[in-house]
Amino acid sequence: GCDALLSGDHGGLLSANGC
């Protein structure tokens, strides 16, 4: 998601909010 660099969510699955 948008926070991939911070959360380690490189696929954007966990932090897709607002993306």
UniProtKB/Swiss-Prot annotation:
The protein's role, per its UniProt record: Presents weak hemolytic activity at physiological concentrations (micromolar range), and weak lactate dehydrogenase (LDH) release from mast cells. Does not induce mast cell degranulation, and antimicrobial effects. In vivo, injection into mice induces very weak or no change in nociceptive sensibility, and very reduced or no edema formation. It also reduces mice locomotion, suggesting an increase in anxiety, but causes no alteration in rearing (standing on hind limbs).
Reported tissue expression: Expressed by the venom gland.
Species for this entry: Tityus obscurus
Key words of the record: Cytolysis, Secreted
Name of the molecule in the record: Cryptide Pep-2
Signal peptide positions (record): none
Any single GO BP term: killing of cells of another organism
One of the record's GO cellular component terms: extracellular region
Compartments where found: Secreted
